[in-house]
Amino acid sequence: MLSDTIDTKQQQQQLHVLFIDSYDSFTYNVVRLIEQQTDISPGVNAVHVTTVHSDTFQSMDQLLPLLPLFDAIVVGPGPGNPNNGAQDMGIISELFENANGKLDEVPILGICLGFQAMCLAQGADVSELNTIKHGQVYEMHLNDAARACGLFSGYPDTFKSTRYHSLHVNAEGIDTLLPLCTTEDENGILLMSAQTKNKPWFGVQYHPESCCSELGGLLVSNFLKLSFINNVKTGRWEKKKLNGEFSDILSRLDRTIDRDPIYKVKEKYPKGEDTTYVKQFEVSEDPKLTFEICNIIREEKFVMSSSVISENTGEWSIIALPNSASQVFTHYGAMKKTTVHYWQDSEISYTLLKKCLDGQDSDLPGSLEVIHEDKSQFWITLGKFMENKIIDNHREIPFIGGLVGILGYEIGQYIACGRCNDDENSLVPDAKLVFINNSIVINHKQGKLYCISLDNTFPVALEQSLRDSFVRKKNIKQSLSWPKYLPEEIDFIITMPDKLDYAKAFKKCQDYMHKGDSYEMCLTTQTKVVPSAVIEPWRIFQTLVQRNPAPFSSFFEFKDIIPRQDETPPVLCFLSTSPERFLKWDADTCELRPIKGTVKKGPQMNLAKATRILKTPKEFGENLMILDLIRNDLYELVPDVRVEEFMSVQEYATVYQLVSVVKAHGLTSASKKTRYSGIDVLKHSLPPGSMTGAPKKITVQLLQDKIESKLNKHVNGGARGVYSGVTGYWSVNSNGDWSVNIRCMYSYNGGTSWQLGAGGAITVLSTLDGELEEMYNKLESNLQIFM
């Protein structure tokens, strides 16, 4: 597989393919499609793919000595324009310039950007389409040359494939290119595939790896068979060097992209039965039960609850109870530091914490540790802490104890960490997680409540209160005794994004997509709410869940430092009514549920009408792009990825939305030398694709540096902070569940001011008015409680 060490004997039965990636978000969909081909030739029934970035090699002089290792090269899709040469494509432009004829016998397949680069090197024109196609499925038409060349062997005359391209190739009059396939739309007849004459170089403009493309595996299989036949005829197959030295080179190349697990996953874990306390009771199945329980809890609590129960979402609620044995992990990305300390350690004050972080005091108080590390190392810190706490116990319960908390948007890949607050003197975390020993877990579908402790310290008085109030009482109050409105005497100053600034940001997104830099850009805004007096966060949460019920409601108020009389700690508060699961996992599988496409509910809008709207080309393409992106994120680590639900329309309290379900199987497969856990998938998948667009790397960088820094200057200077990140848990029984931080509000100052994010995916089919309406609809779901 991608990261496995190569056995020399096994190499002799494999084709070796070099895949050149231009930091695209569909790369591993192609890689896995290549690896899945097994029927290549008698005695050759497997493919090993070595993936490198387009800038891994600085010149062809570095790559040429390695070519005897590879039977073929695949140049993948990516952002940018091939006319910009190495600036956008790295070594790819030099590759197709043929290195003075040294690649004439090397089979090459170019996909999308790779296809354009191949054609450009032959003198073809690559220019912008009048009407761009991103995430749209079209019919492809083969010609006689396609049937003769072998690349499309076994194909019908026409088939459907997904298009993601802003640019197109005009090869008219180019004698060295042999057209193979075309499509037709309002742009006219467009070239979709070609071969460079007298060379084993092929290319396709469409994306064979997309989940909506037909016969993609057959195309790749045909290319691999052609490569093998070519190499036998030219002698490359016999010349391929397979000694130990070259095995080491292949293995080193495989490691140029970091896919090491965060911690070493064991085959077996202890049961932990001696210390784990689990007490089960029968209770009401009503989802309001969670909130009624919260009414009697006097201890500090974090709540991950559901107000809406549906199949596989909202079935469970969790109340986590931090105490003095709970360790708190906080990462400050801009400082490149992580703090670790026990919950409400009496020796730690905010003033001392800030001095230690600023380097003014090297004498660390109490349990405080300050670790100098960047955000990539922060994951290792979490892994080292958790790896000896994992137990094989009660895996049927989603959470029995472990880390709970928030991972902000900037903790994800490709994003620069920056200060996310107006107050330059405050400390703003990019991630905050607390280890929980004691918790209350409720199964709403089965009417079961669990009191759980990892160290046998569950509060006796609380358990007795739960017994007295809720056990075997199948009916609770018909209506929750929580207020639906905030106090009337409180006024709010609301600062919303400027419409003119939004229009400028929308225009920039369109410009970047038309240039080929992105397929889809998730443009987000920030709104600031300042109350005339501080309202307790729990009081706001009570109103929020009443007004906007959702399957992934969350309440986090991090009072992990006890304030001194002269201090006002910058308490992070997070209140969410998110409809979207990001990632759920158990010991061997993980699931993502991307949501894209939104229609507001109203008297004139029903499910049937919303379904028609959400299945239009714009909404379909928006969802398909994220679906293919998520498949890519999973395929990077796991070979078995399946789309188990494809774009179903689901109903929520205020909107209808388009939802898909993607699952990966085999995280800890014994056949693999590298065993992963769900936390590895989480790290490699952040930030959530539904909140970025694609390709992820260049898109998030453009959004952060060129667009949102100006659009949201009234709040965060462009940083999203908590919004667009994820909230959830990593349980010691190898389960995890994280929701996307949308339909949420958050405060870095204990409720003195609140921030609300809202946005939507911009595609070339988007309209300014349509996106503004969608953004305001999403914003209104939570902003309504302040109005």
Swiss-Prot record:
Catalytic activity: chorismate + L-glutamine = 4-amino-4-deoxychorismate + L-glutamate
Active site annotation, chain numbering: 112, 207, 209
Pathway the protein contributes to: Cofactor biosynthesis; tetrahydrofolate biosynthesis; 4-aminobenzoate from chorismate: step 1/2
Chain residue ranges for the region called PABB component: 304-787
EC number: 2.6.1.85
Example GO biological process: tetrahydrofolate biosynthetic process
InterPro entries recorded: ADC_synthase, Anth_synth_I-like, Anth_synth_I_N, Chorismate_C, Class_I_gatase-like, GATASE, PabB_fungal, TrpG/PapA_dom
Domain named Glutamine amidotransferase type-1: residues: 16-233
Keywords, alphabetical: Cytoplasm, Folate biosynthesis, Glutamine amidotransferase, Multifunctional enzyme, Transferase
Location within or outside the cell: Cytoplasm
Main location: cytoplasm
Keyword Transferase on entry: yes
GO MF entries: 4-amino-4-deoxychorismate synthase activity
PROSITE patterns: GATASE_TYPE_1
GO CC annotations, alphabetized: cytoplasm
Family: In the C-terminal section; belongs to the anthranilate synthase component I family.
Function (record text): Catalyzes the biosynthesis of 4-amino-4-deoxychorismate (ADC) from chorismate and glutamine. Required for the synthesis of 4-aminobenzoate (PABA), an important component in tetrahydrofolate biosynthesis.
Note: Present with 1550 molecules/cell in log phase SD medium.
NCBIfam families hit by this protein: PabB-fungal, trpG_papA
Entry note about domains: The PABA component provides the glutamine amidotransferase activity. The PABB component catalyzes the formation of ADC by binding chorismate and ammonia.
Protein name (database record): Aminodeoxychorismate synthase
Organism from which the protein derives: Saccharomyces cerevisiae (strain ATCC 204508 / S288c)
